[in-house]
Amino acid sequence: MTSMPGSGGPTAATTPPPAEAAGRIRRFSRAERWVHRTTAWLMLLCVATAACLYVPQLAELVGRRHLVVTVHEWSGLLIPVPLLAGLASRALRADLSRLNRFGPHDRQWLRAVRRRDHRPGSRPAGKFNAGQKLYAAWIAGAVPVMTGTGLLMWFTGLAPLMWRTGATFVHDWLALAIGIVLAGHMAKALADPEARRGMRTGSVERPWARAEHPLWEESTERPEDPKR
């Protein structure tokens, strides 16, 4: 339908997008979704090529070891790039601030998980629950270590043999741990279609937000506490 003159005025400016008007609330910006998607693909590529290098059956099946090594090295080196580029986004910086803060409600969430308490209200969470914050902290710490040890293995002239041997040990075992943690992260995502839809489209249904992230859902109706 053709807009009438003046339809771009104050009323149009305050009209919410159709998704929000249909009972959905905005969860992630386009920049955040791009960072997540790009980082995920790079990390999956890195893990897949690592498997091809370390599992003999896969190495024999895939072949072309030099190409696999090259793809592994460059995909690993590029993993931090999407996040660094995304820091230009105010929404991403705000979410990083939320991920970096642990509050009393996060400790309550962890206690409820430990007791397997699923009662309503037993697991209060802001925009990110305590599990997501721990996962983000783990990845944020693991990626620089993997990058540093990988560079020592790649450029053999950077350090003596003893250092390179230690770097290889750390790199290999940390890679295995990352693979296990990533598998758990993906399993949780596969079990929650609405969470995946939120990362894909940027918005989620309000009832889901109220059930999974009640403190954040409440804050969407008033000025938000950045600590949540």
Model-assigned labels for residue ranges:
Residues 1-228:
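Membrane-embedded alpha-helical bundles that constitute the cytochrome b-like, heme-associated redox core
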